[in-house]
Structures are given as structure tokens and as C-alpha cells.
Curated annotation (Swiss-Prot):
Family: Belongs to the bacterial ribosomal protein bL17 family.
Taxonomic lineage of the native organism: Bacteria, Pseudomonadati, Pseudomonadota, Alphaproteobacteria, Rhodobacterales
The keyword Ribosomal protein is assigned to this record: yes
UniProt GO molecular function: structural constituent of ribosome
Lineage: superkingdom: Bacteria
GO biological process entries: translation
Subunit text: Part of the 50S ribosomal subunit. Contacts protein L32.
Gene Ontology CC annotation, any one: cytosolic large ribosomal subunit
HAMAP family, alphabetized: Ribosomal_bL17 (MF_01368)
One protein family per Pfam: Ribosomal_L17
NCBIfam families: L17 (TIGR00059)
PROSITE patterns with a match to the protein in the record: RIBOSOMAL_L17
Protein name: Large ribosomal subunit protein bL17
InterPro entries membership: Ribosomal_bL17, Ribosomal_bL17_CS, Ribosomal_bL17_sf
Length: 140
């Protein structure tokens, strides 16, 4: 019986799961949309939603808590500067999961996990330069 089993183990150790979700959360923050298996997407959603809530709090302690969960500083910066501003008026529900068929090799159910109101031009590292160019063009 699976009473009081609060999460999916995904056939991984605790440390492996922790690293997996840290990497996936960073990728989702960087690209704003990723494709993964459905169980991983369902487990990732509450992790990312809590990170967005930390970003909305915006204080130093929240930034340190987010940095402890994410691996890269650029992801923490985007979380607090871009995403927190985007979702400041939204009370939860920052992420959506769309079913995306089945993987060819093993028929694993796939899903696309993305931010609601996402930036469709988000392509990772070039984001900061692109946003700076758009702001400069808007000021002129």
C-alpha cells in the first residue's frame, strides 16, 4: 500500500532527484518551456511554483533560498528580475503542463511544461542582450 507517499521517486536516489529537479528548474527558467516525461513535469511544477513565489518575495533571504535550489546564478537573476515582475499580480498557477504524446523509443508519456504568459522569444543566454535592446529601442 502506498499510504503517505507524497511524491514520485522516479527510480532515483534522493540526491539524484534533487540534482535532476535543480537542473530542470534552471532549464525551465532559462528557456521558459521544456519537453520532458509527464511524471517529471508533474513533480517539477510545485518546485517551480515555489521558486516563483520566492522571486515575488524578493528579499535577500528569498534570494539565498532560491540560490540554494538552483545551480546557476543567471537563473536566480532571471527569476527575481524578469519572472517575479511578470507574475507579481498572479496568485499562483504560473506553470502549465501540456501532454505531448508518447516517446518513440519506449512509449513514455511526454509533456511540455511552460510558463503561463511566457516570452516566446526566450532562448537562454541571449535573453539579457535582447531585452536590453528592446528597452533601448522603446526609450528612443
Amino acid at each position: 500500500m502506498r499510504h503517505a507517499r507524497g511524491y514520485r521517486r522516479l527510480n532515483r536516489t534522493h540526491e539524484h532527484r534533487k540534482a535532476l529537479f535543480a537542473n530542470m528548474a534552471g532549464s525551465l527558467i532559462e528557456h521558459e518551456q521544456i519537453k520532458t516525461t509527464l511524471p517529471k513535469a508533474k513533480e517539477l511544477r510545485p518546485i517551480v511554483e515555489k521558486l516563483i513565489t520566492l522571486g515575488k518575495r524578493g528579499d535577500l533571504h528569498a534570494r539565498r533560498q532560491a540560490a540554494a535550489q538552483l545551480k546557476e546564478d543567471k537563473d536566480v537573476a532571471k527569476l527575481f528580475d524578469v519572472l517575479a515582475e511578470r507574475y507579481k499580480d498572479r496568485q499562483g498557477g504560473y506553470v502549465r503542463i501540456l501532454k505531448a504524446g508518447f516517446r518513440y523509443g519506449d512509449m513514455a508519456p511526454m509533456a511540455i511544461i511552460e510558463f503561463v504568459d511566457r516570452d516566446v522569444d526566450a532562448k537562454g543566454a541571449a535573453d539579457k542582450a535582447r531585452l536590453a535592446e528592446e528597452e533601448a529601442a522603446a526609450e528612443e
